[in-house]
Amino acid sequence: MQREDVLGEALKLLELQGIANTTLEMVAERVDYPLDELRRFWPDKEAILYDALRYLSQQIDVWRRQLMLDETQTAEQKLLARYQALSECVKNNRYPGCLFIAACTFYPDPGHPIHQLADQQKSAAYDFTHELLTTLEVDDPAMVAKQMELVLEGCLSRMLVNRSQADVDTAHRLAEDILRFARCRQGGALT
């Protein structure tokens, strides 16, 4: 069994069962691999959680890079693409971004490696948004990026509890409104 396969299945379990309820034993059972063998690579639940979140983080980073290089989409489409990706996740009963929110709650110490990993992902998301907003030459891209990221984080938090497409739709609409408002301000319509 490949490491990525184990981590992928661990992520699915974490999304379904939550960080608190997922055990190393559950992962071993899900991947049909002896627990003792699994412990050679991940001695405890925290180790596999860290690796699974790091693996997810790498996947998200690759997705963002590919999106940035996609010349068929406008900057606006790229900014809103996360909501289409989240809709796809909801459709497949997957809630990966929520794990970073949950990880910060479960490991509140900012110095903890899992909390730091979640913070790095949050920072990378902000940088992605800020870069695209700067490309669009919106007024105060840092503030608009903070607003858009706050909407995204709120959406992920709601998904953690409700697992609802309606929350994704609402957040998508709000992000569109923030972007439209920023573009109007850029054009001098709101001065």
Swiss-Prot record:
GO biological process, one term: negative regulation of DNA-templated transcription
Gene3D superfamilies reported in the protein's UniProt record: Tetracycline Repressor, domain 2
The keyword RNA-binding is annotated on this UniProt entry: no
One GO MF term attached to the UniProt entry: DNA binding
InterPro entries per record: Homeodomain-like_sf, HTH_TetR, Tet_transcr_reg_TetR-rel_C_sf
Span of domain HTH tetR-type: 1-60
Protein name per UniProt: HTH-type transcriptional regulator YjdC
Organism, scientific name: Escherichia coli (strain K12)
Keywords: DNA-binding, Transcription, Transcription regulation
